[in-house]
């Protein structure tokens, strides 16, 4: 989570959408360390700024407002991603980055745990602009310009903090038909409201 008091916007950070990379880019290029706030990430070495001890990582809207009531007057945005793609990203992150699941756990076994990055409860109360990960860079150019600064796409691409964690194969190749439906049910709101579909390339 990042609050720019200097530019009056809030980024509600969701999982598996490049949120830590975006935080790090903003901190390095468009951040006032004296007044802006960020929960940071110990996993990705993104620094923490100007928040109470224990305020880390992914934070929901009501907690953000309690910490800084001024945010109700700010622009608010978040990022979402195709749920089926997002779950594949979570699987490789848990298995290969932080060791939360065994190395020999298959993707289908992981899907059946339903330990998914469902994040809408973090942001819906804030009524944010929801940027789709699939065209995030173009949308961030427009959003940042509206906030008074330029988003440098090429520079941002150098901040890919979790690159190399997953195979380059299309996400659909990981799925069985049963897996598809489990994820569809878990992300029903995102699929219906953000118009996501399972793109089958199996």
Residue ranges and their predicted role:
Residues 1-202:
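Membrane-interface amphipathic segments in extracytoplasmic regions
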């Amino acid at each position: 989570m990042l609050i720019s008091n200097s530019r009056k916007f809030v980024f509600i950070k969701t999982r598996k959408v490049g949120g830590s990379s975006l935080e790090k880019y903003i901190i390095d290029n468009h951040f006032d360390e004296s007044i802006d706030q960020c929960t940071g990430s110990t996993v990705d070495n993104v620094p923490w700024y100007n928040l109470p001890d224990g305020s880390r990582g992914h934070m929901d809207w009501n907690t953000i407002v309690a910490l800084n009531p001024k945010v109700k007057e700010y622009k608010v945005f978040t990022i979402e991603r195709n749920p089926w793609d997002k779950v594949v990203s979570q699987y490789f992150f848990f298995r290969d980055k932080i060791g939360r699941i065994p190395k020999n756990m298959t993707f289908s076994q992981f899907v059946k745990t339903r330990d998914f990055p469902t994040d809408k409860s973090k942001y819906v109360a804030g009524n944010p602009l929801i940027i789709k990960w699939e065209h995030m860079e173009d949308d961030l150019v427009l959003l940042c310009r509206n906030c008074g600064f330029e988003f440098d796409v090429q520079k941002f691409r150098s901040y890919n903090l979790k690159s190399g964690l997953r195979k380059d194969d299309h996400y659909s190749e990981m799925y069985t038909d049963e897996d598809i439906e489990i994820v569809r049910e878990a992300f029903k709101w995102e699929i219906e409201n953000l118009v996501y579909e399972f793109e089958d390339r199996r």
